[in-house]
Amino acid sequence: MMAAVDAILAGKYPAKAHARRVAESLQSYRNGCPGIVYLEAQKTRLIEDNDEPAPFRQRRPFFYLSGCPLPDSCLVYDLSEDQLTLFIPPVDPEDVIWSGLPMSTEEAQNQYDVDRVLVTTELNSTLASIVSSHGGKAIAFTIADQVSESTQFHGFSEVNHSVLKGVIEQSRVVKDEYEVALLRKANDISAKAHIAAIKASQTAVNEREIEGAFIATCIANGAREQSYHPIVACGENGATLHYGKNDDTLIDPVTNQKKRNVLIDAGGEYRTYCADITRVIPVGGKFTAETRQIYDIVLQMQTECIAMLKEGVQWEDVHAHAHRVAIRGLLKLGILRGAEDEIFEKRVSVAFFPHGLGHYLGMDTHDTGGNPNYADKDTMFRYLRVRGRLPAGSVITVEPGVYFCRFIIEPYIKSPESNKYIDTNVLDRYWRVGGVRIEDNVLVTKDGYDNLTTAPKAVDELERLAAS
């Protein structure tokens, strides 16, 4: 499988196809008028009060239409002529002393899927030439606050800052073969890193050691950046969805024994594309009885939800199904009590599963085009990052979870509307579980799905790796 992926990635990133996709969506805003798309790369900048460069992250709209990771660059796409021009910085002799020769225009032409490559000092003359060739009736589409003061749109009939960003973000929802290969590669590297993290738990005494094993494996395999700050949460820390400390001891101060589970939510970024994977590590090679019970519920939630995926499925329906499975499992354990339908309608399960089932994935971890409604008064759907039907070619995370967060659950216990559905005597046995989340990255296809994530999640395999 990965040999075929590497063969695809040996080719050029399909920037021209992406430009054409964006151009098609811009037609209704042009009214037959010629136009251009203008995008800038991220600028190099220094850390505040320092002469060191700040961490660089390429602007996603620019990368989507260029495949170019270089800072201080820009592009122009002539919509009428179907000509994509990349502009890269010229040689700065003083910078060569420190950093060596930069990429030449000839090298860039060979590497990127563009029609021509010029240097940035030629930008304004090129813009003037384009607008002149169209008789001064061209529209320039660009993104607000992402245009340098030195860029000149003299002669253009209109400069539209309002529509391009949204058009690109919607175009990014459906991935092509090359993008899927990038996401699969990011997942493959991240799976190796998760295995390394699981094995590291055997000797680790602090969360940071597990984080270090994950990051080191990503870098060694070609993913130099993380998709997001890793979450490495032992014990009750796992009840915090975006826990970020990653510096707690794995030794329980009461028992002086190792805490028995670590939630790790982490993914490497490969050539701008992200993986986003969550696993729970049975520290010492064995889940506690309570953690295993919750893990089985969450794995069932994920298994059934992934099986529902195909082109056109309503994501809200999949999310609601996850809650149904959670309710059944928690009823069986005795944490919840009462009728399933009543618990569902009263939204009591939100106390244990407060977030959305998943989000689009691509160049951003929480990728664009999901149309969330964070003002939704229905607490079950308020934090669902994707609303509506899933198109074939979209990649979505499926990440159900069950959590025992006192801050979230205690108001439900105190409320007369919901406390009758929660058995606190049974619940008290599960606080130390913290949280269980299982997350995979799944490609939606016409008739089903393709799970891009290969990191182990079966209980026997996790326990074997954690014991090795």
UniProtKB/Swiss-Prot annotation:
Swiss-Prot/TrEMBL keywords: Aminopeptidase, Hydrolase, Manganese, Metal-binding, Metalloprotease, Protease
Binding-site residues, Mn(2+) 1: D276, E399, E439
Cofactor: Mn(2+)
Domain of life of the native organism: Eukaryota
Catalytic function, reaction form: Release of any N-terminal amino acid, including proline, that is linked to proline, even from a dipeptide or tripeptide
Listed GO MF terms: manganese ion binding; metalloaminopeptidase activity; peptidase activity
Sequence positions that bind Mn(2+) 2: D265, D276, E439
Gene3D superfamilies in alphabetical order: Creatinase/methionine aminopeptidase superfamily (3.90.230.10), Creatinase/prolidase N-terminal domain (3.40.350.10)
Cofactor binding, per record: Binds 2 manganese ions per subunit.
Enzyme category, top tier: hydrolase
Enzyme Commission number, as recorded: 3.4.11.9
GO biological process: proteolysis
CDD domains, A to Z: Prolidase
SUPFAM superfamilies: Creatinase/aminopeptidase (SSF55920), Creatinase/prolidase N-terminal domain (SSF53092)
Annotated function: Catalyzes the removal of a penultimate prolyl residue from the N-termini of peptides.
Family per similarity comment: Belongs to the peptidase M24B family.
Protein name: Probable Xaa-Pro aminopeptidase pepP
Gene: pepP
